Structure formats: C-alpha cells, structure tokens
C-alpha cells in the first residue's frame, strides 16, 4: 500500500477509521445489479480511500465489486471491506420497479423516465422499453410519477433458507441488516442465519430509521437496544447505521438534514457501538453535522445515490466510447477527482 500524498484516513484500517470518526462507506445499492457500473464505482471509490463497499448478496455483484477493488489495490489503494446487504422483511432498498410497456399509452409524456436517477427506464436510457431491472435500485420515485398508475414494486428479499450457503460462498467481511419496527423475531432469525453461515464477520451493521414509520426517536432507540441484545448474544460486533432519508442523497442539500436530525435525536441514548450516518447523505452532511454538539461521537458516513449520480456522466461517456471507466485513461482521473472531493472531507476530519 502506498499512502504518499493521501489523506491520513485512507491509510487507516476500517476499524481505525471507525474509531477516529473518519469512516467512509460506498453503497452500491442492495438491489443494484448494474455490473459494469458497480465495477467502475468500486474501483474509483476504493482508490479515493473508502473503507467499506456495500452491495447486493449476489455472486455476480460481488465479483464486480472485487474486480473494482483489485484494480484500485493494484494502484496502491488499501483494500476496503466487502459488506453485503440483507433485510429482515420488506424494505424499500430491496425492491425493483416494474411495468408492462405495452400498457403505456403512446402519448404519455413518460415522467417516470425523467425522475429515474439510475437511468433505468425507457428506450433513450436503456435501449429497450420498460424497466431495465439490473439498473433499478428501488428508489421508488417512478411510482408516484406515473400518471396512469402502471408501475408496481416487486420485492427482492432473500429467502432465509438461501442465506447461510450464499454467505459461505461469498465470504464478505461484514453484513448490513436492514430492520424495521416490530420485526425483532425476523431480525433474530436473520442473525441465526448469519451464524449458520460460519463466516467470521468483522462487523454486523444494523440499518434503521424513522422514514415511513410512525415511530418516535425514543421508540427507535428501544428497538436498537433490543437488536443490540440479540447481536451480543450471537457474538457479533454492531455498527449502527442511522438511515435518515433513504436513497435520496443525489437530490440536494435538504436531504442531508434528515440523517443529521435523526442522529441528534438517537445518538445520546444509542446502544454501544460506532454510529454512522446514511440516507440522504451528500457533500452537505458534514458541514451540517459540525453544528451538532456530539459530532465527535459520529464514526463516519455512507454515500450511495450521490456517489452514483456524481460519476454517472463519466460512466455514460466511457460507455459511449465502448470501454469501462477504469480503462479510460482520460476519464478515470476526472472520476477520481470527483470521488475525492466527496470523501476527502471525511478522511481529513479532525
């Protein structure tokens, strides 16, 4: 590993980054299966210094993530953890949009195509009508946009019987488990499946928030303590991901407030373990966090939608040239510069 000229935190181990408040995670998307884009994103953000990359429990996705990490490691980057995402039930992160394009009226202005941040809908973006499933990561913005109500969501939750074998085959460093209020039993079942895999996890991240629930912050804290008891009994080390406004970081400054507001309400009573922000995070998150009295207790941040949107124009330009972004000697330095602008403030955080 060559750390010359790099921020201090890009040379820290993931555990050291968590302990020092400089942890940065890249979220590829729990339902994202756009393999070419995933490989490019993981290569660029690994070289930029992220400590962890989170993706779908899918062999092809994991292979793409590892190819990107290998590319960056060959250029002097530290190797980030591979984290895989699961849910203990239905969850917006684990869904795909779907509709029958034959039912779409010819005169429809197709607002679904304009609001899709993944460019997963329509002929112009994908070369085919309908939704390109591998690109869709379940943000849900197309659902209310359709004037005819034709778009539906299809759940992508992994069956419990498949979890142990898949994890044993994929060998992640960590797992993220999305949970919702009242799902303590389902959460415990997932934890049992993780133990049955035999994989020695560095951390088990628990992702939870208030978006789409009627819960109060104290009720969420109580749920987290319940999850903590289960994790401790199972021998897992927790990482708490407070999910402000899921899959919205590309929308602008306002989305960053949700995660900061959530952490301000939950952190003082949170169970032991590092706390990381997610859900609406972007370049505005850290400046907003600096006004928070307990900011030094925050372990770090995860970037998802904003990271993907940031590099999207360059990914498309490389695609138009018939090559990957990592293979384009002109474009990949530009992409690396953009990625570093996003992650360096956290890597250099004091």
Each language-model region and where it sits:
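Extended, intrinsically disordered, low-complexity segments
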Residues: 15, 304-350
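Iron-sulfur cluster-binding cysteine motifs and their immediate structural context
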Residues: 109-131, 141-158
């Amino acid at each position: 590993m060559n750390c010359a000229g790099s921020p201090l935190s890009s040379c820290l181990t993931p555990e050291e980054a968590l302990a020092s408040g400089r942890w940065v995670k890249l979220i590829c998307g729990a339902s994202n299966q756009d393999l070419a884009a995933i490989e490019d994103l993981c290569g660029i953000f690994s070289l930029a210094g992220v400590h962890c990359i989170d993706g779908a429990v899918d062999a092809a996705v994991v292979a793409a993530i590892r190819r990107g990490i290998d590319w960056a490691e060959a250029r002097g980057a530290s190797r980030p953890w591979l984290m895989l995402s699961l849910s203990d039930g239905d969850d917006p992160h684990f869904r795909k949009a779907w509709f029958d394009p034959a039912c779409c009226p010819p005169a429809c202005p197709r607002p679904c195509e304009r609001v899709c941040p993944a460019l997963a809908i329509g002929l112009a973006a994908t070369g085919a009508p309908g939704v390109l499933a591998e690109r869709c990561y379940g943000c849900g913005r197309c659902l209310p946009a359709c004037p005819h109500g034709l778009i539906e969501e299809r759940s992508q939750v992994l069956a419990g019987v498949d979890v142990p074998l898949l994890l044993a085959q994929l060998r992640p460093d960590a797992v993220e488990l999305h949970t919702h209020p009242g799902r303590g039993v389902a959460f415990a079942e997932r934890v049992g499946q993780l133990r049955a895999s035999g994989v020695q996890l560095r951390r088990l991240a628990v992702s939870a928030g208030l978006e789409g629930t009627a819960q109060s912050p104290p009720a969420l804290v109580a749920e987290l303590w319940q999850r903590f008891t289960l994790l401790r009994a199972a021998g897992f080390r927790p990482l708490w991901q407070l999910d402000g406004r899921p899959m919205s970081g590309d929308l602008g400054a306002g989305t960053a407030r949700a995660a900061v507001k959530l952490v301000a309400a939950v952190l003082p009573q949170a169970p032991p373990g590092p706390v990381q922000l997610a859900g609406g995070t972007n370049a505005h998150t850290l400046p907003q966090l600096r006004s928070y009295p307990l900011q030094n207790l925050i372990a770090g941040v995860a970037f998802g939608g904003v990271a993907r949107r940031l590099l999207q124009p360059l990914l498309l330009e490389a695609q138009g040239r018939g090559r990957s972004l990592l293979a384009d000697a002109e474009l990949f330095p530009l992409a690396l510069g953009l990625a570093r602008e996003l992650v360096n403030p956290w890597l250099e955080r004091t």
